[in-house]
Curated annotation (Swiss-Prot):
Phylogenetic lineage: Eukaryota, Viridiplantae, Streptophyta, Embryophyta, Tracheophyta
Site for Essential for proton translocation, residues: 141
The name this protein goes by in its record: V-type proton ATPase 16 kDa proteolipid subunit
Organism from which the protein derives: Vigna radiata var. radiata
Pfam families (alphabetical): ATP-synt_C
Keywords from the named record: Hydrogen ion transport, Ion transport, Membrane, Transmembrane, Transmembrane helix, Transport, Vacuole
Membrane topology: Multi-pass membrane protein
Length: 164
């Protein structure tokens, strides 16, 4: 039997954080891609020349999944209870890191999807709205970036609970 140093339930919370980061971020990316993709498809029937210009919300929504992947990889590389002690503090730090990034990605994906859908449809009617749509999408994407930054900070706190 291998020896284990630390709390035996702590890795569960760490892996749960990695899963939460990836799952929630990908849910946001999927919603944003689907919602804005429907807008692009319906707009493309009327103005097919604007399809490539209107694909921006779909791309921005797809990036959200990458943020969750980054945090999930950071968390999973920090979980190695056989190499060093892994305590509940570490598991909770990784869980909060994953939830911060994942839920921020989910909310950003919802915002990007709704704004992207309405924005590309409105852009077909009035091309001057394109810059405004892009600015709103950037602010929605910033929500996910905030979650990524906080997630990195929280995951770096793991391992600081002990004096060794």
């Amino acid at each position: 039997m291998a020896s284990f140093s630390g709390d035996e339930t702590a890795p569960f919370f760490g892996f749960l954080g990695a899963a939460a980061a990836l799952v929630f971020s990908c849910m946001g990316a999927a919603y944003g891609t689907a919602k804005s993709g429907v807008g692009v498809a319906s707009m493309g029937v009327m103005r097919p020349e604007l399809v490539m210009k209107s694909i921006v919300p779909v791309v921005m929504a797809g990036v959200l999944g990458i943020y969750g992947l980054i945090i999930a990889v950071i968390i999973s590389t920090g979980i190695n209870p056989k190499a060093k002690s892994y305590y509940l503090f570490d598991g909770y730090a990784h869980l909060s890191s994953g939830l911060a990034c994942g839920l921020a990605g989910l909310s950003a994906g919802m915002a990007i999807g709704i704004v992207g859908d309405a924005g590309v449809r409105a852009n077909a009617q009035q091309p001057k709205l394109f810059v405004g749509m892009i600015l709103i999408l950037i602010f929605a994407e910033a929500l996910a970036l905030y979650g990524l930054i906080v997630g990195i900070i929280l995951s770096s706190r793991a391992g600081q609970s002990r004096a060794d």
